[in-house]
């Protein structure tokens, strides 16, 4: 969802220093001490202030394929795979066959009573959980739902509860297990302190009590949910929030053509050279040198940031992240078929209901096709390892 609380749906400001020192507003319950796990939760109570219709999303007709991909030619390769792409020669990863245990964590925050209140995030959790159970064999007792309409304090999406649930999600995961993480709420950016971001900003998400207890930064989400995973474990993540393109800090990013994205040095060079030409026209030789030096410094800094990410943020596990927008974009809090919803969450479910036998590139294009008629945001696919987007079918 766009911006962060209090910024407005189309705001472009960053979250640096934001959300500190404010008292929590409405609906916050302190976490219970000594909580050691997540028992099965009852369905969340219906406290929607906007009256969503019964029955959930209105989707396009589905293809009838409930069993999912079966063509062996499109199944994930088995065994350890080499990274390549400039990674150290001893780096290897393993695709998950997604035949093992399934666990899911879904978070939806409407920020009731707070500035920047949203409408569709809780609906996203309800609809995504139903979709997982209907089409991907997830069980309700293996899901944790955190929404800010919950009566149980442990089901509120506070910072402590979210962090605890992230640890629960990955604990004990084994090869070929399939884990699912979904976040629908406010997202933003804050200054990058460890040098792993090309644009100088880390991506963050905002718990319901962020004013009192702060946001959660992408470096920490990677530490808690990606680093503990062993080879062959799948984590599928969906971020329906602003500035979420690399919200899990995964180093391999793909476009709709399936090509690995690199820093756009040609574009940066154009800006740098334009400044140099303008300075030369004014007779400002010092300005020429400054413009060219500035470009060279920026290019070197971008390369350093990407090299650091490639060294520190890869994983032997099979981690895929679908994001509602690029790092510099906002995401839409939409109304579809009279129901408030996150546009990315709706598009993801709609694309898979229509056809589950899609490669990663086909699915990314399907999601963008659903969105592009009404929204400017461009969803993004990122991965913890090199991904054969053209030939391997999406599974989870």
Curated annotation (Swiss-Prot):
Residues 1-20 have a biased composition (Gly residues). The active site is at residues 186, 242. Disulfide bonds: none annotated. It comes from the Eukaryota. Residues 72-81 have a biased composition (Polar residues). Involved in cell death (apoptosis). Belongs to the peptidase C14B family. This is Metacaspase-1. The lineage of its organism: Eukaryota, Fungi, Dikarya, Ascomycota, Pezizomycotina. The gene is MCA1.
């Amino acid at each position: 969802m766009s911006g962060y609380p209090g910024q407005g749906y189309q705001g472009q400001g960053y979250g640096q220093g934001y959300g500190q020192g404010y008292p929590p507003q409405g609906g916050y319950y302190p976490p219970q001490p000594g909580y050691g796990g997540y028992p099965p939760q009852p369905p969340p109570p219906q406290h929607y202030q906007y009256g969503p219709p019964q029955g959930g999303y209105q989707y396009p007709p589905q293809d009838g394929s409930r069993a999912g991909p079966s063509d062996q030619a499109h199944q994930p390769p088995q065994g350890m795979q080499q990274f390549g792409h400039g990674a150290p020669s001893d780096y290897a990863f393993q695709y998950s066959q997604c035949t093992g245990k399934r666990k899911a964590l879904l978070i939806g925050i409407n920020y009731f009573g707070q500035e920047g209140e949203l409408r569709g995030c809780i609906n996203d959790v309800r609809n995504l959980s139903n979709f997982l159970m209907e089409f991907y064999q997830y069980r309700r007792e293996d899901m944790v739902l955190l929404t800010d309409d919950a009566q149980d304090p442990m089901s509120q999406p506070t910072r402590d509860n979210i962090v605890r649930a992230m640890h629960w999600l990955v604990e004990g995961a084994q090869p070929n297990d399939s884990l699912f993480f979904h976040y629908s709420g406010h997202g933003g950016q804050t200054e990058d302190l460890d040098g792993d971001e090309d644009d100088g900003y880390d991506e963050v998400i905002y718990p319901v009590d962020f004013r009192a207890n702060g946001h959660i930064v992408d470096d920490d989400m990677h530490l808690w949910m990606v680093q503990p995973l062993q080879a062959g474990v799948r984590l599928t993540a969906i971020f329906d929030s602003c500035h979420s393109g690399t919200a899990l800090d995964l180093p391999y990013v793909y476009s709709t053509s399936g090509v690995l994205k690199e820093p756009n040095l040609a574009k940066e060079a154009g800006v740098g050279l334009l400044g140099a030409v303008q300075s030369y026209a004014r007779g400002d030789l010092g300005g020429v040198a400054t413009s060219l030096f500035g470009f060279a410094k920026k290019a070197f800094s971008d390369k350093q940031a990407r090299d650091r990410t490639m060294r520190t943020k890869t994983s032997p596990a099979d981690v895929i992240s679908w994001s509602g927008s690029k790092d510099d974009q906002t995401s839409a809090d939409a109304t579809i078929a009279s129901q408030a919803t996150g546009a990315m969450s709706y598009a993801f479910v709609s694309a898979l209901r229509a056809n589950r036998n899609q490669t990663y590139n086909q699915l990314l294009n399907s999601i963008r096709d659903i969105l592009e008629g009404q929204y400017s945001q461009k969803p993004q696919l990122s991965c913890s390892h090199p991904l054969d987007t053209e030939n391997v079918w999406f599974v989870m």
